[in-house]
């Protein structure tokens, strides 16, 4: 009721009819209910990356892509982002079908950022890698403080309702492991903060300066030409019909998917300059994998 009242107050101040926004909230909740449970279907893509590592990408009807890297030698798994928490058991069911011994394997998670549509499997992961700023965000949330998206009066009610509808919970703080070996340079759109090893791959870990959300990170393997961009680059040209429908709802409710749109566009330009046309296999935060021969 409190957050609904905040929305009513905001709409009244802007002379906008509350019925329109609450209809979108109703459609958002109905969409989540109708595409969850037995109706939760992911587009699954299997992609070999190196002689030792392969990727399996799950694209749910709503929420972030869920990418699992598998090390053929050690059988270890790395889960990069993981959709919404309200879908967790159905995501796990699909992962256990692909990897029948999923629960027995060494498995870790890596979060590209703190948004609720990326953290859904956090409670099922023994280790969760993230940037220091992402960890700080979770620590603040655990104390009841607003996330970066809730810092504004306009963002607070919408994101709190989103979290309620999608059953968000702060990831377990005692499982967080920090990617940073340096702080990065916020004078630049993207800057290096460390490195991450998995199998025979070595990723440069880059951090954006807070365009999409503070703590946003990307993983770039320049040797094997593989990039995980989080939401600093998404692929709207190759989404499933449910994903497209959901994406039409979310920005209206949140007003913007970015904390700082000018910074986000500077980050996107830097990402395009670094990757586009250079033979990278690109795994976006949302939408299909961009093949090496495709333009971003």
Q: For each predicted feature, which ranges?
A:
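Hydrophobic "anchor" residues on beta-strands that sit immediately upstream
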Residues: 77-79, 108-109, 127, 227, ...
């Amino acid at each position: 009721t409190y957050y609904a009242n905040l929305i009513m107050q905001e709409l009244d101040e802007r002379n906008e009819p509350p019925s329109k926004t609450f209809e979108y909230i109703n459609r958002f909740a109905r969409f989540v209910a109708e595409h969850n449970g037995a109706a939760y279907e992911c587009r699954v893509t299997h992609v070999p990356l190196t002689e030792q590592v392969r990727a399996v990408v799950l694209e749910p009807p709503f929420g972030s892509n869920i990418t699992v890297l598998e090390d053929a030698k050690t059988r270890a798994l790395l889960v990069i982002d993981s959709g919404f928490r309200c879908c967790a058991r159905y995501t796990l069911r699909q992962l256990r079908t692909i990897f029948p011994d999923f629960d027995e394997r060494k498995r870790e998670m890596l979060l590209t950022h703190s948004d609720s549509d990326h953290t859904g499997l956090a409670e099922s992961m023994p280790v969760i890698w993230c940037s220091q700023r992402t960890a700080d965000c979770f620590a603040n949330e655990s104390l009841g403080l607003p996330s970066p998206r809730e810092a504004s009066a306009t963002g607070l009610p919408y994101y709190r309702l989103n979290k309620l509808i999608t059953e968000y919970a702060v990831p377990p703080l005692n499982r967080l492991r920090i990617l940073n070996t340096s702080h990065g340079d916020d004078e630049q759109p993207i800057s290096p903060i460390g490195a991450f090893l998995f199998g025979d791959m070595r990723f440069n870990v880059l951090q954006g300066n807070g365009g999409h959300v503070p703590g946003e990170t990307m993983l770039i393997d320049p040797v094997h030409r593989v990039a995980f961009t989080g939401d600093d680059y998404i692929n709207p040209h190759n989404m499933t019909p449910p994903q497209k429908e959901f994406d039409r709802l979310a920005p209206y409710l949140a007003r913007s998917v970015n904390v700082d749109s000018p910074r986000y566009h500077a980050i996107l330009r830097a990402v395009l300059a670094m990757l586009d046309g250079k033979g990278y296999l690109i795994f976006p935060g949302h939408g299909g994998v961009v093949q090496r021969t495709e333009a971003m």
